[in-house]
């Protein structure tokens, strides 16, 4: 079965266009991947958002002077489509030699184009470099599980059977790991990420969580689907009162992708981590 992204610019030699070209955006329907997980648009068990940060955003003023900013794009997790990442990059590059009357004018164009591609309203923030620098590098709350000793004998597929919990002990905690890795389903390139699990429910065995996350190491899928799979596997095991799964992926091509899935209100912290 062919992956829908095979028809996108991903993995292909592309001409870089420097004049505004919204047709470069390549949407990919979420429905097929939802179906693989037993979901549909009507049965999504989470709320969420995919936050994209762009560090290579530039355009021209009417006088021809370049402007730079850091873009933050929030795509609802229940939108009909994701936007293929290379097409997103090519689209943003097409702004480089294009003139806009103001920052607000550009933001309106971005909101319009990205919302059409995603099939839902996309939030856009254009942030100054000083503003983002002032935030600094974020530090994760909770416990890092990466120093736990585990034995690993499989990397080819996610292994939810490794997950364990103590049904007799109820906790509220945050666990995180920097060892998440999966591969692009089209190019096979590695995607490196940090994963945060914030939950209230039966105590999750942290070593089993680490072994489970490592089992994604050779798995091929997009960032968004990896996080949704992790969310569903943890929800199935824990039946928690609250659960949030949040991944912060290392940037590629000037873009990083940060999927957030939760049983509760959507309130992600978008400060970049040290590898971003």
From Swiss-Prot:
Coiled coil: none annotated. It is found in: Cytoplasm. GO terms for molecular function: preQ1 synthase activity. Substrate binds at residues 83-85, 223-224. The active site is at 184 (thioimide intermediate), 191 (proton donor). The keyword Hydrolase does not apply. Keywords: Cytoplasm, NADP, Oxidoreductase, Queuosine biosynthesis. Its EC number is 1.7.1.13. Homodimer. This is NADPH-dependent 7-cyano-7-deazaguanine reductase. It comes from Pseudomonas paraeruginosa (strain DSM 24068 / PA7) (Pseudomonas aeruginosa (strain PA7)).
């Amino acid at each position: 079965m062919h992956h829908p992204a095979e028809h996108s610019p991903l993995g292909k030699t592309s001409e870089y266009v420097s004049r505004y070209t919204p047709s470069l955006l390549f949407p990919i329907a979420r429905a097929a991947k939802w179906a693989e997980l037993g979901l549909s648009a009507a049965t999504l068990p989470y709320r969420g958002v995919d936050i994209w940060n762009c560090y290579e955003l530039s355009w021209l003023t009417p006088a021809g002077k370049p402007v730079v900013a850091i873009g933050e794009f929030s795509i609802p997790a229940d939108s009909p489509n994701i936007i293929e990442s290379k097409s997103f990059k090519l689209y943003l590059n097409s702004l480089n030699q294009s003139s806009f009357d103001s920052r607000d004018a550009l933001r309106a164009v971005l909101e319009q184009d990205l919302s059409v591609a995603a099939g839902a309203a996309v939030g856009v923030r254009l942030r100054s470099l000083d503003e983002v620098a002032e935030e600094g590098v974020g530090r994760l709350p909770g416990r890092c599980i990466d120093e736990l000793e585990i034995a690993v004998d499989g990397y080819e597929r996610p292994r939810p059977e490794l997950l364990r919990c103590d049904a007799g002990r109820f906790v509220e905690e945050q666990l995180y790991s920097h060892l998440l890795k999966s591969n692009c389903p089209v190019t096979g390139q590695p995607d490196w990420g940090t994963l945060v699990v914030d939950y209230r429910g039966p105590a999750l065995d942290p070593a089993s969580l680490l072994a489970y996350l490592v089992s994604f190491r050779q798995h091929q899928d997009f960032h968004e689907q990896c996080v949704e799979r992790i969310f569903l596997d943890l929800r199935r095991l824990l039946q928690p009162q609250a659960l949030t799964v949040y991944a912060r992926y290392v940037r590629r091509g000037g873009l990083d992708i940060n999927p957030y899935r939760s049983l509760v209100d959507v309130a992600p912290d978008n400060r970049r981590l040290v590898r971003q």
